[in-house]
């Protein structure tokens, strides 16, 4: 039963990483759904077993309910924002617990790490081949590969930095297989070189930082261990990576451009990549100003966009963003400084304790996989994707199992059965809600009534933000509304500050004689999208 569940979970996770289906508006929905499906299958392993919850996870469980509490007190006005935030946090917590319980026996722990390494290594190779096809402009010949937009390949992840982080985690899997002598060098070296080249193709600056961190971490750890991957090999592979990035890729691009009919995607030089990306500094400065505006309670979980709109006078990057591109700043802006610092301090101390006790190769390499995702989270938002977040939790649980005798409480198998049943119901309802939204949104965009039904109802039950979107699209901006309704719509617009939403909400405000508020949203439109529209133009638009 356990082996079958692990295999099914691995298959679903593989699909999540390789899925080419990216549809509006939740572009990674298929990947998110299958990632949660994999987690449900792992829960099934414990339907007939009691499960231990170690002491570090007890406080973490309390923290997972913060979004629901914020919703109860009105800080988050949309139920689905709070519920999805809770769902991601709770499932992340549950993956830590499951990873811990599955790895309490040292032999089982090593087998699980070997299985994870094989999986990551093989999917990394497939993703690398996809990225190379995109670089060569050959992806259109393969239905299972996404078309490339831009100049940085991303395989089926849709985002180059996400691909780079995943490939680095896959390389850590290769390192574990090498240390455990599970694959021959004639397989490991060419496959790892292919993955490394695909990582270079992404031109991810995050991967440079991860590489430097790995270099020094491995030097520090090898003094207490005797790894096969010793310092000379470490130096050779690190140098190989930077030579590929600085010299080999531009040379290959130049040669292939003249010799292949389709040409190749032109890539930026390492100097160009190093000299770009300064807009993050502007984002961070604006978020710091936003935190200063609401230091005690913050803006609510996953509501960075509201902070951006409300601190628009400090915006210098002229771009809308719904993440601070730094998980620490996000935690502070969502929860306020006191609670945010408590969460950051607790998690940091736990991670430090895990690292301090990491003495075997399994823990060291699992922590390197974790570090790749966490470093990325300091510069972007991989934690918002279930295909990163849930494996991250599982790996952290596996590392924690290096100390199997932690004080813990035992959760009865009946509780696990209830959790599994509720999770399955929510899983099916979310699939239903999203499918219903997609079907009805097509009708609304055609000017028709949203009459599609699933299971005899057209009402969206959990994903309320999508129901609000349907109502918003169908709403005539020349509609009289109460102060309360206008305020609720304003929160929705701030949390999804697209040009369409900002402009339409401005029309609605003008029609309801809220000219001062309308001018403020026109300023937001100008600062974020460089679209300068006067109040008189909005009035004229309403008079048509």
Where are these regions (language model features)?
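Transmembrane signal-anchor hairpin modules in multi-pass inner-membrane enzymes, especially those
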Residues: 1-84, 90-118, 177-186, 405-491, ...
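Alpha-helical transmembrane segments of multi-pass inner-membrane proteins
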Residues: 6-18, 34-44, 64, 68-71, ...
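Short aromatic-rich membrane-water interface segments that cap or initiate transmembrane helices
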Residues: 21-24, 75-87, 148-163, 272-276, ...
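Helix-loop-helix junctions and helix-breaking kinks within/between transmembrane helices
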Residues: 22-29, 158-161, 189-224, 248, ...
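TM-adjacent membrane-interface loops and short helices in multi-pass inner/ER membrane proteins
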Residues: 159, 279-321, 328, 335-341
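Hydrophobic alpha-helical segments of polytopic membrane proteins
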Residues: 178-251, 392-402, 413-421
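Flexible juxtamembrane loops connecting transmembrane helices in multi-pass membrane enzymes
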Residues: 214, 246-284, 438-448
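Transmembrane alpha-helices of multi-pass inner-membrane enzymes
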Residues: 215, 361-414
């Amino acid at each position: 039963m356990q082996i079958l569940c692990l295999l099914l979970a691995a298959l679903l996770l593989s699909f999540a990483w390789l899925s080419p289906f990216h549809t509006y508006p939740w572009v990674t929905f298929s990947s998110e759904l299958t990632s949660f499906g994999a987690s449900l299958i792992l829960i099934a392993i414990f339907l007939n077993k009691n499960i231990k919850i170690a002491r570090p996870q007890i406080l973490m469980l309390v923290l997972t309910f913060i979004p629901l509490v914020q919703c109860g007190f009105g800080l988050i006005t949309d139920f689905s924002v709070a519920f999805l935030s809770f769902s991601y946090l709770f499932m992340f917590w549950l993956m830590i617990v499951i990873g811990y319980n599955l790895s309490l026996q040292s032999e089982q722990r090593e087998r699980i790490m070997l299985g994870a390494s094989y999986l990551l290594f093989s999917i990394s190779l497939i993703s690398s081949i996809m990225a190379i096809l995109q670089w060569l402009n050959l992806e259109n010949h393969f239905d299972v590969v996404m078309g490339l937009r831009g100049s940085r390949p991303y395989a089926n992840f849709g985002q180059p930095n996400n691909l780079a982080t995943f490939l680095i985690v896959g390389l850590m899997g290769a390192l574990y297989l090498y240390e455990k002598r599970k694959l021959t060098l004639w397989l490991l070296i060419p496959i790892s070189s292919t993955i490394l080249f695909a990582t270079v193709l992404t031109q991810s600056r995050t991967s440079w930082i991860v590489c430097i961190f790995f270099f020094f971490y491995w030097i520090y750890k090898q003094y207490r261990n005797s790894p096969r991957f010793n310092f000379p090999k470490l130096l050779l592979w690190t140098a190989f990576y930077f030579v590929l990035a600085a010299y080999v890729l531009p040379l290959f691009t130049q040669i292939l451009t003249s010799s292949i009919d389709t040409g190749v995607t032109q890539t930026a030089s390492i100097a160009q990549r190093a000299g770009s990306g300064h807009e993050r500094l502007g984002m961070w400065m604006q978020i710091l100003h936003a935190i200063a505006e609401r230091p005690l309670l913050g803006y609510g979980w996953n509501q960075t966009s509201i902070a951006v709109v409300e601190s628009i006078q400090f915006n210098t990057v002229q771009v809308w963003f719904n993440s601070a591109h730094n998980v620490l700043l996000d935690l502070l802006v969502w929860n306020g400084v006191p609670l945010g610092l408590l969460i950051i301090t607790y998690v940091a101390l736990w991670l430090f304790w895990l690292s301090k006790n990491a003495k075997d190769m399994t823990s060291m390499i699992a922590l390197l996989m974790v570090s790749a995702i966490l470093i990325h989270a300091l510069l972007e938002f991989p934690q918002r994707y279930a295909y990163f977040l849930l494996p991250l939790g599982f790996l952290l649980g596996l590392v924690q199992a290096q100390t199997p005798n932690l004080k813990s409480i035992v959760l009865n198998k009946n509780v696990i059965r209830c959790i599994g049943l509720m999770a399955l119901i929510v899983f099916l309802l979310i699939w239903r809600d999203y499918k219903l939204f997609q079907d009805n949104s097509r009708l609304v965009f055609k000017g028709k009534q949203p009459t599609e039904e699933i299971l005899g109802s057209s009402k969206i039950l959990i994903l309320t933000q999508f129901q609000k979107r349907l109502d918003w699209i169908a709403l005539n901006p020349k509609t009289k509304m109460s102060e309360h309704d206008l305020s609720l719509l304003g929160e929705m617009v701030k949390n999804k500050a697209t040009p369409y939403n900002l402009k339409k909400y401005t029309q609605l405000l003008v029609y309801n004689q809220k000219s001062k508020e309308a001018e403020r949203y026109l300023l937001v439109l100008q600062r974020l999208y460089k679209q300068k529209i006067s109040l008189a133009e909005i009035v004229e638009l309403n008079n048509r």
